[in-house]
């Protein structure tokens, strides 16, 4: 038995096919979803979506959004997403270094919050590349 997974951003469809299992980053922690999962709607956190195909795991960097699960259908609507295999590791590490520097020189509450978000996004992109199996 399989699940139909659809990952969407406001501009494009990132993924639309059948999968065996996913591990989804939510605001309350990661959840694993297998066929016949109980219906839920949940907020999606910045983090790594892990997708199991037959004998292979694929990663995707998600930048926050919402997910609806029910009747073996998973719809994930996110602000942005990238497949781990599409991310350039050197570019992602460069962005991470810039984000860390920006956090260190951030002044004021708003700049610190924005710098922390940018750092989380950058770390997620690097992690998506590094966890490809």
Curated annotation (Swiss-Prot):
One of its GO terms (cellular component) is chloroplast thylakoid membrane. It is found in: Plastid, Chloroplast thylakoid membrane. Pfam families: ATP-synt_DE, ATP-synt_DE_N. It comes from the Eukaryota. GO terms for molecular function: ATP binding; proton-transporting ATP synthase activity, rotational mechanism. It is a peripheral membrane protein. CDD domains: F1-ATPase_delta. Keywords: ATP synthesis, CF(1), Chloroplast, Hydrogen ion transport, Ion transport, Membrane, Plastid, Thylakoid, Transport. InterPro entries: ATP_synth_F1_dsu/esu, ATP_synth_F1_dsu/esu_N, ATP_synth_F1_esu_C, ATPsynth_dsu/esu_N. The keyword Thylakoid applies. SUPFAM superfamilies: Epsilon subunit of F1F0-ATP synthase N-terminal domain. Produces ATP from ADP in the presence of a proton gradient across the membrane. F-type ATPases have 2 components, CF(1) - the catalytic core - and CF(0) - the membrane proton channel. CF(1) has five subunits: alpha(3), beta(3), gamma(1), delta(1), epsilon(1). CF(0) has three main subunits: a, b and c. Belongs to the ATPase epsilon chain family. This is ATP synthase epsilon chain, chloroplastic. It comes from Piper cenocladum.
């Amino acid at each position: 038995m399989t699940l139909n997974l659809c990952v969407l951003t406001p501009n494009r469809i990132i993924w639309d096919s059948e999968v065996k299992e996913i591990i989804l980053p939510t605001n309350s922690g990661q959840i694993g979803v297998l066929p016949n999962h109980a219906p839920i709607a949940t907020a999606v956190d910045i983090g790594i979506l892990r997708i199991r195909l037959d004998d292979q795991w694929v990663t995707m960097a998600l930048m926050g959004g919402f997910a609806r699960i029910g009747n073996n259908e998973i719809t994930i609507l996110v602000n942005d997403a990238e497949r781990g295999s599409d991310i350039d590791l050197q570019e992602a590490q460069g962005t991470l270094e810039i984000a860390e520097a920006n956090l260190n020189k951030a002044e004021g509450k708003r700049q610190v919050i924005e710098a922390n978000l940018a750092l989380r996004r950058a770390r997620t992109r690097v992690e998506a590349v590094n966890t490809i199996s």
